[in-house]
């Protein structure tokens, strides 16, 4: 109090007073924090609308405002990054920052955008590389190029007449050797067609009392096995067109053949599979029994350790080199299993296809004895073959379209569907370079298709590509 008895007036602050300002209350701090961090708690898939007259401040980023503000002495060494960031923030239509040397009044106009925003923008991608907007709208971001699907020619590049090519689902009358020679059984004769020279050679004639039911090349491509309707298996020297030996065992026709080095497996209508070592004097070294109906499909794995067999009893069996009983049995198919193919890319991966009542391609892991997947193709599966160049396979089909389908594995997406045959496509073989397939049908034609790419490890021209186009006869 002063001398008059009045209270002293409160001190007034001056310009030179260095006393600190009063601290904000905790409630004010929480309010400011909520305002600053409001964007971080907004759902990326939810659009928030504000009042029709009051803009939504949550959509604004004031901390980034000076990105586009000209600054004296700013280093322009990171112009590329600045351009990319500006595009991500304000869009591709915003002009770049201008310096005072360029103009005295820098423009902050945002074309095609409202100054006030009345709703928050919804982020399009939860995996966006940009923290501000969808990558698709940022032209400065380089995306991985989308690989265009490989184009497969829809027409065969060559057609051969094949008179007397039988329309029998249980036979295997076409095979392609490692020496690029195609063997075809026509009636009671076997013909060889050299894919390099287009030369046709008549290998054998079984006579009027017999007919060819199967052909199969040895892995070296020098010898051809011929299964006959009388139950015999003949071995021919292809270069000399000379029969080396004839082996018995089957009581009925031999419709399936498969080689494993010097071991030849034959499957017949008598439900049996015979293992024959052509180096020995005996006609067969073992007999495999298990199927309850005709054996119509046989394939050795690429490591020659497992033999897969399919029969008209709707069964798929897997045998090893020493077993006389199947080590694996698969009974999921509901029709005859003729189409069998081992993957050259993954050990133990086996594909099989069922007949008219089944229509499915199934995949099996013989290492773990498991069923992997099933694809309903919509029609009879007549044959299967894997590409050795890419992880794809081809299936041939019967009624109603008689189509040839190229599949990607494991997605089983269709790469191409080829048509042209007027009968079911019963026969299928692949060229030694892995690029071309040949298909045969009861319409008595053989059609050649380029479906697979060349091997990446070598730059080779397809030996088949030099062949003349058009239609010729194989005999």
Swiss-Prot record:
<dbReference type="InterPro" id="IPR056150">
    <property type="entry name" value="WD40_CDC20-Fz"/>
</dbReference>
<keyword id="KW-0132">Cell division</keyword>
<dbReference type="InterPro" id="IPR015943">
    <property type="entry name" value="WD40/YVTN_repeat-like_dom_sf"/>
</dbReference>
<feature type="repeat" description="WD 3">
    <location>
        <begin position="249"/>
        <end position="289"/>
    </location>
</feature>
<dbReference type="Pfam" id="PF24807">
    <property type="entry name" value="WD40_CDC20-Fz"/>
</dbReference>
<comment type="pathway">
    <text>Protein modification; protein ubiquitination.</text>
</comment>
<keyword id="KW-0221">Differentiation</keyword>
<feature type="modified residue" description="Phosphothreonine">
    <location>
        <position position="99"/>
    </location>
</feature>
<feature type="repeat" description="WD 6">
    <location>
        <begin position="376"/>
        <end position="417"/>
    </location>
</feature>
<feature type="repeat" description="WD 2">
    <location>
        <begin position="207"/>
        <end position="246"/>
    </location>
</feature>
<dbReference type="GO" id="GO:0009624">
    <property type="term" value="P:response to nematode"/>
</dbReference>
<dbReference type="GO" id="GO:1905786">
    <property type="term" value="P:positive regulation of anaphase-promoting complex-dependent catabolic process"/>
</dbReference>
<comment type="function">
    <text>Component of the anaphase promoting complex/cyclosome (APC/C), a cell cycle-regulated E3 ubiquitin-protein ligase complex that controls progression through mitosis and the G1 phase of the cell cycle. Required to switch form cell proliferation to cell differentiation, endoreduplication and ploidy-dependent cell enlargement, including during nodulation, before nodule differentiation. Involved in root-knot nematode Meloidogyne incognita giant cells formation.</text>
</comment>
<feature type="short sequence motif" description="PEST motif">
    <location>
        <begin position="7"/>
        <end position="28"/>
    </location>
</feature>
<keyword id="KW-0597">Phosphoprotein</keyword>
<protein>
    <recommendedName>
        <fullName>B-type cell cycle switch protein ccs52A</fullName>
    </recommendedName>
</protein>
<feature type="modified residue" description="Phosphoserine">
    <location>
        <position position="155"/>
    </location>
</feature>
<keyword id="KW-0539">Nucleus</keyword>
<feature type="repeat" description="WD 1">
    <location>
        <begin position="166"/>
        <end position="203"/>
    </location>
</feature>
<dbReference type="InterPro" id="IPR033010">
    <property type="entry name" value="Cdc20/Fizzy"/>
</dbReference>
<feature type="repeat" description="WD 5">
    <location>
        <begin position="332"/>
        <end position="374"/>
    </location>
</feature>
<dbReference type="InterPro" id="IPR036322">
    <property type="entry name" value="WD40_repeat_dom_sf"/>
</dbReference>
<feature type="repeat" description="WD 7">
    <location>
        <begin position="420"/>
        <end position="459"/>
    </location>
</feature>
<keyword id="KW-0498">Mitosis</keyword>
<feature type="repeat" description="WD 4">
    <location>
        <begin position="290"/>
        <end position="329"/>
    </location>
</feature>
<feature type="region of interest" description="Disordered">
    <location>
        <begin position="1"/>
        <end position="29"/>
    </location>
</feature>
<keyword id="KW-0853">WD repeat</keyword>
<keyword id="KW-0536">Nodulation</keyword>
<dbReference type="GO" id="GO:0005680">
    <property type="term" value="C:anaphase-promoting complex"/>
</dbReference>
<feature type="modified residue" description="Phosphoserine">
    <location>
        <position position="45"/>
    </location>
</feature>
<dbReference type="GO" id="GO:0031145">
    <property type="term" value="P:anaphase-promoting complex-dependent catabolic process"/>
</dbReference>
<feature type="short sequence motif" description="C-box">
    <location>
        <begin position="51"/>
        <end position="57"/>
    </location>
</feature>
<dbReference type="GO" id="GO:0051301">
    <property type="term" value="P:cell division"/>
</dbReference>
<dbReference type="InterPro" id="IPR001680">
    <property type="entry name" value="WD40_rpt"/>
</dbReference>
<feature type="short sequence motif" description="CSM motif">
    <location>
        <begin position="80"/>
        <end position="91"/>
    </location>
</feature>
<dbReference type="GO" id="GO:1990757">
    <property type="term" value="F:ubiquitin ligase activator activity"/>
</dbReference>
<feature type="modified residue" description="Phosphoserine">
    <location>
        <position position="454"/>
    </location>
</feature>
<dbReference type="GO" id="GO:0030154">
    <property type="term" value="P:cell differentiation"/>
</dbReference>
<keyword id="KW-0677">Repeat</keyword>
<dbReference type="GO" id="GO:0009877">
    <property type="term" value="P:nodulation"/>
</dbReference>
<dbReference type="InterPro" id="IPR019775">
    <property type="entry name" value="WD40_repeat_CS"/>
</dbReference>
<dbReference type="GO" id="GO:0010997">
    <property type="term" value="F:anaphase-promoting complex binding"/>
</dbReference>
């Amino acid at each position: 109090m002063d001398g008059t008895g009045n209270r002293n007036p409160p001190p007034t602050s001056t310009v030179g007073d260095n006393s600190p300002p009063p601290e904000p209350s905790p409630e004010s701090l929480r309010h400011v924090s909520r305002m600053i961090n409001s964007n971080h708690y907004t759902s990326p898939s939810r659009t928030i609308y504000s009042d029709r007259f009051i803009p939504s401040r949550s959509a604004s980023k004031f901390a980034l405002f000076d990105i586009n503000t000209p600054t004296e002495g700013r280093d322009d060494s990171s112009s590329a990054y600045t351009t990319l960031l500006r595009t991500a923030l304000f869009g591709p239509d915003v002009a770049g920052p201008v310096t005072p040397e360029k103009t005295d009044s820098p423009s902050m106009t945002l074309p095609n955008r409202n100054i006030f925003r009345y709703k928050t923008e919804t982020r399009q991608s939860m995996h966006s590389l940009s923290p501000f907007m969808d990558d698709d709208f940022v032209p400065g971001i380089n995306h991985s190029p989308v690989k265009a699907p490989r184009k497969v020619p829809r027409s065969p590049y060559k057609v051969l007449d094949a008179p007397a090519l039988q329309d029998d689902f249980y036979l295997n009358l076409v095979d392609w050797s490692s020496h690029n020679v195609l063997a075809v059984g026509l009636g009671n004769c076997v013909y060889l067609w050299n894919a390099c020279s287009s030369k046709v050679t008549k290998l054998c004639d079984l006579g009027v009392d017999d007919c060819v039911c199967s052909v199969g090349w040895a892995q070296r491509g020098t010898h051809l096995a011929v299964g006959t309707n009388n139950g015999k298996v003949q071995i021919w020297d292809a270069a000399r067109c000379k029969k080396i030996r004839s082996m018995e065992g089957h009581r009925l026709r031999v419709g399936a053949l498969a080689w494993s080095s010097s071991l030849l497996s034959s499957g017949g209508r008598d439900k049996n599979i015979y293992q024959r070592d052509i180096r020995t004097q005996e006609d067969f070294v073992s007999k495999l029994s298990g199927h309850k109906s005709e054996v119509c499909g046989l394939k050795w794995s690429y490591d020659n350790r497992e033999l897969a067999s399919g029969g008209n009893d709707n069964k798929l069996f897997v045998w090893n080199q020493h077993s006389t009983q199947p080590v694996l049995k698969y009974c999921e198919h509901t029709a005859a299993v003729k189409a069998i193919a081992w993957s050259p890319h993954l050990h133990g991966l086996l594909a099989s296809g069922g007949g008219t009542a089944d229509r499915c391609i199934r995949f099996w892991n013989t290492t773990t004895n498991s069923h992997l997947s099933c694809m309903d193709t919509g029609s009879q599966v007549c044959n299967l073959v894997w590409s050795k160049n890419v992880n794809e396979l081809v299936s041939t089909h019967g009624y109603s379209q008689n189509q040839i389908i190229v599949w990607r594995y494991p997605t089983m997406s269709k790469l191409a569907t080829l048509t042209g045959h007027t009968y079911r496509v019963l026969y299928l073989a692949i060229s030694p370079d892995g690029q071309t397939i040949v298909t045969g049908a009861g319409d008595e034609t053989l059609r050649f298709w380029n479906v697979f790419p060349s091997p990446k490890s070598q730059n080779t021209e397809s030996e088949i590509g030099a062949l003349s186009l058009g239609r010729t006869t194989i005999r």
